[in-house]
Amino acid sequence: MHLARLVGSCSLLLLLGALSGWAASDDPIEKVIEGINRGLSNAEREVGKALDGINSGITHAGREVEKVFNGLSNMGSHTGKELDKGVQGLNHGMDKVAHEINHGIGQAGKEAEKLGHGVNNAAGQVGKEADKLIHHGVHHGANQAGSEAGKFGQGVDNAAGQAGNEAGRFGQGVHHAAGQAGNEAGRFGQGVHHAAGQAGNEAGRFGQGAHHGLSEGWKETEKFGQGIHHAAGQVGKEAEKFGQGAHHAAGQAGNEAGRFGQGVHHGLSEGWKETEKFGQGVHHTAGQVGKEAEKFGQGAHHAAGQAGNEAGRFGQGAHHAAGQAGNEAGRFGQGVHHGLSEGWKETEKFGQGVHHAASQFGKETEKLGHGVHHGVNEAWKEAEKFGQGVHHAASQVGKEEDRVVQGLHHGVSQAGREAGQFGHDIHHTAGQAGKEGDIAVHGVQPGVHEAGKEAGQFGQGVHHTLEQAGKEADKAVQGFHTGVHQAGKEAEKLGQGVNHAADQAGKEVEKLGQGAHHAAGQAGKELQNAHNGVNQASKEANQLLNGNHQSGSSSHQGGATTTPLASGASVNTPFINLPALWRSVANIMP
């Protein structure tokens, strides 16, 4: 609005300039025109200065923004380098960890070899002791015809409830397959593992347990130092080994088997307990899913109701899988842990086996050299001591505690106990409550101590290796943390640089804004000056016109011409009275 009026005023003044030739040299109109020209020139110069200031501010801000981006690029590059250093440190730490683990595995292999030698030595010692002691246990067969055959250092095992044959080999256990003919394969120092109810496969390696499958056809073969495995309810075989326990077949009249220096454990048609001692394994499966745990050189493992395979480790117990199909894989020095039909936890220690509990929650804890075995259909716990095995039978909740070279045996269909003294075989016959105790002169096998020492050394070697690997892993983690920390510092620096650059850019933008405001303010001042110049010219023109008008025609005094134009840009008041102007021009002309 002001600019339009300014242009209009300029046009008018140009018109007045054309008339200036008619005026005298000291004509007031000429002064008006000169004042207007000076005001316009000053305004133009001020506007030019304002535009120059704005351009300068924009250029300076652009430079500062460019500096900000350069700083960001530099910090990003530096951070990338630091991250590379951190990753390299982490890789180096991982290489050390892998190297130490490989070294530890080699060391563990050596220790395992020592352990194997110790086991062989212990087995030889046991054999010598067996030569000294010639003791047989008498085993009673109940409710069915059965044959019993005893070999040197073995007990006679009775098969009850079905026709069965029993064959014992020196240093071997008796293995019974239930529900179907079955086979079991065992290796030295291992337990035999039984899988029931479905077809399963079992593979045993040195230091592992052999696994038995029930309800489908399989074989049972055992080697020295293995446990006895029982299967219930069908025709089966039972074999006993030296230093092992007898296994009872349930659901019918039961059998009792005694071992060298061991007790016979009987369980029939109801829940029962089975306990094993070092060199023994009593394994019961009766009328329900049951499980069996074995100890060093012994233990039989039973799996019921579903297919399962079990793999055992050197010097460990066998692990039972029941109620569902499952496979178990064991590693050196470790046990395989299977959980069935419900969730549970299993914890094991080195040299221990993990034993399965079926159909309910169960926990199992094991100590070195023994396994914990859980019974089926109810939740329970079993704890074993070295040289002992706690075995629970199915259909009832029960616990069993063994002491070394003693067996506590429970009879079926009637309440009965069997207590054996060291060197006793306790045999129970089913259908009546009774006790049988045989006292014999047995020896304790010293090979256990030797094997225990070797196992201890092995465990120490493994722990040492794991500790070393743990240290290396700690170093790797520390290196990684260091790299991350360094990268964090660099990122922090980057963030600081970004913040600084942003602050700087903000300052520059602020300066730019201030410069723009200043330039705008300056331009506003110049425009005000221009308006002031126009107003001044208008005042002079009005004064001139008013003076001429007063001398020429008093009828038009005052009026709008007396309105001062100090406001210049007043909205509705014209700053020149055109009729008075023309009258003044006419009066001036001769």
UniProtKB/Swiss-Prot annotation:
Residues 182-213, 242-266, 297-338, 545-570 are annotated as: Disordered. Residues 190-200, 243-254, 297-330, 546-559 have a biased composition (Low complexity). It is found in: Secreted. Detected in thymus, uterus and esophagus. Residues 560-570 have a biased composition (Polar residues). GO terms for cellular component: extracellular exosome. The keyword Transit peptide does not apply. It holds the Pfam family SBSN_GxHH_rpt. It comes from the Eukaryota. Its main location: secreted. The keyword Lyase does not apply. Keywords: Secreted, Signal. Induction: Up-regulated in differentiating keratinocytes. Residues 1-25 form the signal peptide. PANTHER family: SUPRABASAL-SPECIFIC PROTEIN SUPRABASIN, SUPRABASIN. This is Suprabasin. The lineage of its organism: Eukaryota, Metazoa, Chordata, Craniata, Vertebrata.
